[in-house]
Swiss-Prot record:
Its EC number is 1.1.1.267. Signal peptide: none annotated. 1-deoxy-D-xylulose 5-phosphate binds at K125, S151, E152, S182, H205, S218, N223, K224, E227. This is 1-deoxy-D-xylulose 5-phosphate reductoisomerase. Pathway: Isoprenoid biosynthesis; isopentenyl diphosphate biosynthesis via DXP pathway; isopentenyl diphosphate from 1-deoxy-D-xylulose 5-phosphate: step 1/6. One of its GO terms (molecular function) is 1-deoxy-D-xylulose-5-phosphate reductoisomerase activity. InterPro entries: DXP_reductoisomerase (IPR003821), DXP_reductoisomerase_C (IPR013644), DXP_reductoisomerase_N (IPR013512), DXPR_C (IPR026877), DXPR_C_sf (IPR036169), NAD(P)-bd_dom_sf (IPR036291). Belongs to the DXR family.
Length: 393
């Protein structure tokens, strides 16, 4: 039995992972679950999957869960705090780690899993955005297996040669990577109307079912910008080798353009259970519960270039990548502050890129050669961004 620990089991990726795991009880065992404070939801997950351990980041939520579980399944160990997350992913009973915590909060436990040599199903792109060099070094040194779960990077993984994955793109005969993006809910909205976009509108993605933070990132296309940075680290690519293509149908999840003129694409319905099942079963494949792709119903696939006036966050991400050091960390921190401020209705949708650009101009990046350096840049950028939100609000 393969022991699977899920970081962020109550989020959309975590729930999709459990849906896939439930189909194979003879092959996978849910070793540990974690959440921030969603007690009712994780309680139901505990009743169904009976993990050995559960971690609630919030101590009060952990105590509530402990009191609810003890009369029913007293054998489940409930703990709290960020350090407990590192404990479950490094446990000898954990073979695979689904890294699905959203944002910078997922960095430390995911890095711990890499250092422990686990198979990591990486849905937390911020781990690579913030500490790409450190993270990839940890994977290499420990012999960990790193499988991308973002649909785009999983598609690229499937379209790349199976041999020599560690080689740079030109050694694999790859000319460029084509990352597809839906364009989110506002790809055709008049620019003059974007000031008045509400959080609920921004979270209504036309194709994917996602959490609120990543839905806003999709609407601004910062999500695609972060994915560009992630792809650079995963595939040893330069920024100039990655092109973003708007593809509203979200059927082609990404493409690889080879030097001989061949372009390989991975297609499928927009359902995260596909890359999750691929990561769990690799190098094999297994049924995931995803609906059969009906090309006749889709009819046509369309593509266009992204408009950087409409999506300035994408340009900011490329600029941060080119600048190097902890600039990507600063970008991510400012974005997390900006998105939360927008969701809290403290700033406008169009102020998200303005706050990020403002923060990038005021926080000096350093060399990203240690975890303390990365965390320091993250903390400084958050403080600077939060102070500016207070001035605007």
């Amino acid at each position: 039995m393969i022991g699977v620990s899920i970081l962020g089991s109550t989020g959309s990726i975590g729930m999709s992972t459990l849906d896939v795991l439930a189909r194979y009880p003879e092959r996978y065992r849910v070793q540990a679950l974690s959440a921030n404070r969603s007690v009712a939801q994780i309680y139901q997950q505990c009743l169904q999957f009976r993990p050995s351990q559960v971690v609630m980041v919030d101590p009060d939520a952990a105590e509530q869960l402990r009191q609810r579980l003890h009369p029913v399944v007293p054998e489940i160990e409930v703990s709290s705090g960020s350090e407990a997350l590192e404990t479950i992913v490094t446990s000898p009973d954990t073979d695979y780690v689904m890294a699905a915590i959203v944002g910078a909060a997922g960095l430390l436990p995911t890095l711990a899993a890499a250092r422990a040599g686990k198979r990591i199903l990486l849905a937390n792109k911020e781990s690579l955005v913030m500490s790409g060099q450190l993270f990839m070094s940890a994977v290499s040194e420990s012999g960990a297996e790193l499988l991308p779960i973002d649909s785009e990077h999983n598609a690229l993984w499937q379209c790349m040669p199976a041999e020599g994955r560690e080689l740079p793109l030109h050694r694999k005969g790859v000319r460029r990577i084509l990352l597809t993006a839906s364009g989110g809910p506002f790809r055709e909205r008049a620019l003059s109307e974007l000031d008045n976009v509400t959080p609920d509108e921004a979270c209504a993605h036309p194709n994917w079912s996602m959490g609120r933070k990543i839905s806003v990132d999709s609407a601004t296309m910062m999500n695609k910008g972060l994915e560009v940075i992630e792809a650079c680290w995963l595939f040893d690519a330069a920024a100039c080798q990655i092109e973003v293509v708007l593809h509203p149908q979200s059927v082609i999840h990404s493409m690889v353009d080879y030097v001989d003129g061949s372009v390989l694409a991975q297609l499928g319905n927009p359902d995260m259970r596909t890359p999750i099942a691929y990561g769990l079963a690799w190098p094999e494949r297994m049924e995931s519960g995803v609906t059969l792709l009906d090309l006749f119903a889709i009819g046509q696939l369309t593509f266009c270039q992204p408009d950087l006036q409409r999506f300035p966050c994408l340009g900011l991400a490329y600029a941060a990548l080119e600048r190097g050091g902890t600039c990507s960390t600063i970008l991510n921190a400012a974005n997390e502050v900006a998105v939360q401020a927008f969701l809290d209705q403290r700033i406008q949708f169009t102020q998200i890129p303005k706050l990020i650009e403002w923060t990038l101009g005021r926080v000096t990046p350093t060399v990203a050669d240690s975890l303390p350096a990365v965390l320091e840049s993250d903390a400084v950028a958050r403080q600077v961004a939060k102070e500016q939100v207070e001035r605007w609000y």
